[in-house]
Amino acid sequence: MENILGLVALACGLIVGLGAIGASIGIALMGGKFLESSARQPELINELQTKMFILAGLIDAAFLIGVAIALLFAFANPFVLA
């Protein structure tokens, strides 16, 4: 029982930690490419900015889904037999 709870706690930490790292790297790369493309073609800044914010929201949504799954495992643990 304690072994399962320890492994679930470790898994929750990995889900949140790796999800945060992945989301931050993705948003950083996307922001860098946005700045590069807006410097190259300044007349497209409005269109690119709209698309960048939509994609940033989708990247954050994927991270928040991972956080929700980690919270499910932490508080309503389906691996522990009742």
From Swiss-Prot:
UniProt site positions, description: Reversibly protonated during proton transport: D60
Q: Where in the cell is it found?
A: Cell inner membrane
Q: What role does this protein play?
A: F(1)F(0) ATP synthase produces ATP from ADP in the presence of a proton or sodium gradient. F-type ATPases consist of two structural domains, F(1) containing the extramembraneous catalytic core and F(0) containing the membrane proton channel, linked together by a central stalk and a peripheral stalk. During catalysis, ATP synthesis in the catalytic domain of F(1) is coupled via a rotary mechanism of the central stalk subunits to proton translocation.
Its record classes its membrane topology as:
Multi-pass membrane protein
Q: GO terms for molecular function, please?
A: lipid binding; proton-transporting ATP synthase activity, rotational mechanism
Which GO cellular component terms, listed alphabetically, does the Swiss-Prot or TrEMBL entry include? plasma membrane; proton-transporting ATP synthase complex; proton-transporting two-sector ATPase complex, proton-transporting domain
- Oligomer and partners: F-type ATPases have 2 components, F(1) - the catalytic core - and F(0) - the membrane proton channel. F(1) has five subunits: alpha(3), beta(3), gamma(1), delta(1), epsilon(1). F(0) has three main subunits: a(1), b(2) and c(10-14). The alpha and beta chains form an alternating ring which encloses part of the gamma chain. F(1) is attached to F(0) by a central stalk formed by the gamma and epsilon chains, while a peripheral stalk is formed by the delta and b chains.
* InterPro entries to which the protein is assigned, alphabetical: ATP_synth_csu_bac/chlpt, ATP_synth_F0_csu, ATP_synth_F0_csu_DDCD_BS, ATP_synth_F0_csu_sf, ATPase_proteolipid_c-like_dom, F/V-ATP_Csub_sf
Keywords assigned by UniProt?
Answer: ATP synthesis, Cell inner membrane, Cell membrane, CF(0), Hydrogen ion transport, Ion transport, Lipid-binding, Membrane, Transmembrane, Transmembrane helix, Transport
Q: Which gene encodes it?
A: atpE
Any keyword 4Fe-4S?
no
What's the family?
A: Belongs to the ATPase C chain family.
Tell me the lineage of the source organism. Bacteria, Pseudomonadati, Pseudomonadota, Betaproteobacteria, Burkholderiales
Q: What PROSITE patterns does the record tag this protein with? A: ATPASE_C (PS00605)
Question: Which top-rank group of organisms is this from?
Answer: Bacteria
Q: Output the NCBIfam families linked to this UniProt entry.
A: ATP_synt_c, PRK06876.1
Q: Does the keyword Protein biosynthesis apply?
A: no
Q: What is this protein called?
A: ATP synthase subunit c
User: Which species does the entry assign this protein to?
Assistant: Delftia acidovorans (strain DSM 14801 / SPH-1)
**Residue spans crossing the bilayer:** 7-27, 53-73
